[in-house]
Amino acid sequence: MNHFELFGLPNQFELDGGLLSLQFRELQKRFHPDNFATSSERDRLLSIQKAAQINDAYQTLKNPVSRAEYILSEQGHDIRGEQTTMQDPMFLMQQMELREELESLPSSSDPESALFDFAENVTAMRKSQLVQLQELLKNEAWIEAAQSVRKLKFIEKLNQEVEQLEEKLLG
């Protein structure tokens, strides 16, 4: 049983996050190890394994990047943990320029405002990449979808760096 089937969801990238959370809570209640405290050793172990499977599946599906990686792995294109280098020089150049811009923000005349604008740009890039990824997965363009996930990972990392700088500037 795959992660989508476990939660009774369609096997697709786009999903209802509210329904995922609802199903997660229901499954957690049903298979919580405390419910099997008086059961046989075998049943207790099975409930622990099932609870771990439910938690793992939920963590995978709630995050768009890990969800896309999971879908790709189910289609024979497992890119989780890969060390493949990005093959898109224009995208890499853009990422380098964005990181340079991010590094220069603290010394700008209004760092908070500049960071806010920069963060909005990164958020727009992320949304655009997610839309593209959704379309590629829907069309079963697995190779291109894998490349899109790699780009999304770069954007996610950049977003983390934005959040770190925000904490540094405001905290």
Curated annotation (Swiss-Prot):
Keywords for the protein's UniProt record, in alphabetical order: Chaperone
Entry-linked Gene3D superfamilies: DnaJ domain, HscB, C-terminal domain
InterPro entries to which the protein is assigned, alphabetical: DnaJ_domain, HscB, HscB_C_sf, HscB_oligo_C, J_dom_sf
GO biological process: [2Fe-2S] cluster assembly; protein complex oligomerization; protein folding
Cross-referenced SUPFAM superfamilies: Chaperone J-domain, HSC20 (HSCB), C-terminal oligomerisation domain
Domain J as annotated: residue spans: 2-74
GO molecular function: ATPase activator activity; protein-folding chaperone binding
One GO cellular component term: iron-sulfur cluster transfer complex
HAMAP family tied to this protein: HscB
Described function: Co-chaperone involved in the maturation of iron-sulfur cluster-containing proteins. Seems to help targeting proteins to be folded toward HscA.
Quaternary context: Interacts with HscA and stimulates its ATPase activity.
Entry similarity comment: Belongs to the HscB family.
Protein name: Co-chaperone protein HscB homolog
Native organism: Aliivibrio fischeri (strain ATCC 700601 / ES114)
